[in-house]
């Protein structure tokens, strides 16, 4: 990656803490970027923290923007997430499958629950873990209080969601859906090698090759 001689610049304060800024020297002058915007120019997207609607909207927007910039060049999605909302995660998943560029996924830290589903949803042959990361799959969580008939409706819905998520994991791993249902019945933690053997990822990366 050529950052054209960036230097450490001012630091932006956000609600999430400190975000480093980089100064880029070009023939047209000097420009400053927050580090995530600069990496977006290299087609790198970060999915970090709880999966919820606002974060999902940002990730979807970045995926669509990078497709419009170059529909034939890979997008790199770095994941460090404990999971979160199923509907928010599915909006990211569907967009990953919808757009033309391959989306390469990389687990840094952890990819749990919906984070694990998005990790395995990357393009075949382009799903990675770093050596000390971890992956966790399980069934969706839910709870509801109210009239018995409403509880019955919500029970049917969460069972339907459970089956859909198992279908997705089965599709991307090649595992029979019956096996996936058993393996997601409780929290199922995996190290990178176990995740690779299961088919959730394709490779464990120790060093950047290029």
UniProtKB/Swiss-Prot annotation:
Q: Which GO terms describe its molecular function?
A: ATP-dependent peptidase activity; ATPase binding; serine-type endopeptidase activity
Q: What is its main location?
A: cytoplasm
SUPFAM superfamilies, sorted: ClpP/crotonase
Q: Which InterPro entries match?
A: ClpP, ClpP/crotonase-like_dom_sf, ClpP/TepA, ClpP_His_AS, ClpP_Ser_AS
Give the multimer and partner information: Fourteen ClpP subunits assemble into 2 heptameric rings which stack back to back to give a disk-like structure with a central cavity, resembling the structure of eukaryotic proteasomes.
Q: Is the keyword Heme in the record? A: no
List all membrane-crossing ranges.
none
Put simply, this protein is called ATP-dependent Clp protease proteolytic subunit
Q: Give the first-level EC class, as a single word.
A: hydrolase
Organism, by scientific name, is Marinomonas sp. (strain MWYL1)
Q: What Enzyme Commission number(s) apply to this enzyme? A: 3.4.21.92
| GO process terms (BP) | protein quality control for misfolded or incompletely synthesized proteins
Protein's job? Cleaves peptides in various proteins in a process that requires ATP hydrolysis. Has a chymotrypsin-like activity. Plays a major role in the degradation of misfolded proteins.
- NCBIfam families (alphabetical): clpP, PRK00277.1, PRK12553.1
Name the UniProt key words of this record, in alphabetical order: Cytoplasm, Hydrolase, Protease, Serine protease
The keyword Protease belongs to this UniProt entry's keyword annotation: yes
GO CC list: cytoplasm; endopeptidase Clp complex
Task: Name the family the entry cites.
Answer: Belongs to the peptidase S14 family.
Q: Which CDD domains match?
A: S14_ClpP_2
- Provide the active-site residues from the annotation: 113 (nucleophile), 138
* Reactions accelerated catalytically: Hydrolysis of proteins to small peptides in the presence of ATP and magnesium. alpha-casein is the usual test substrate. In the absence of ATP, only oligopeptides shorter than five residues are hydrolyzed (such as succinyl-Leu-Tyr-|-NHMec, and Leu-Tyr-Leu-|-Tyr-Trp, in which cleavage of the -Tyr-|-Leu- and -Tyr-|-Trp bonds also occurs)
């Amino acid at each position: 990656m050529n950052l054209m001689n960036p230097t450490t610049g001012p630091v932006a304060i956000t609600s999430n803490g400190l975000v480093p800024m980089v100064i880029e020297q070009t023939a047209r002058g000097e420009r400053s970027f927050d580090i995530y915007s600069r990496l977006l120019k290299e087609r790198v997207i970060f999915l970090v923290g709880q999966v919820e609607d606002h974060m999902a909207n940002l990730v979807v927007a970045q995926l669509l923007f990078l497709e419009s910039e170059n529909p034939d060049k890979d997008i790199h999605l770095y994941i460090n997430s404990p999971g979160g909302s199923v509907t928010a995660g599915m909006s990211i998943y569907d967009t990953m499958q919808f757009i033309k560029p391959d989306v390469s996924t990389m687990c840094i830290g952890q990819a749990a629950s919906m984070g694990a589903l998005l990790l395995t949803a990357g393009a075949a042959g382009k799903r990675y873990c770093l050596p000390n990361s971890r992956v966790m799959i399980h069934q969706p969580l839910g709870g509801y209080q109210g009239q018995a008939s409403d509880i019955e409706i919500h029970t049917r819905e969460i069972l339907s969601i459970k089956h859909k998520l198992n279908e997705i994991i089965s599709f991307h791993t090649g595992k029979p859906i019956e096996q996936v249902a058993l393996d997601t019945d409780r929290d199922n933690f995996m190290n990178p090698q176990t995740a690779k053997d299961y088919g959730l990822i394709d490779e464990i990366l120790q060093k950047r090759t290029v």
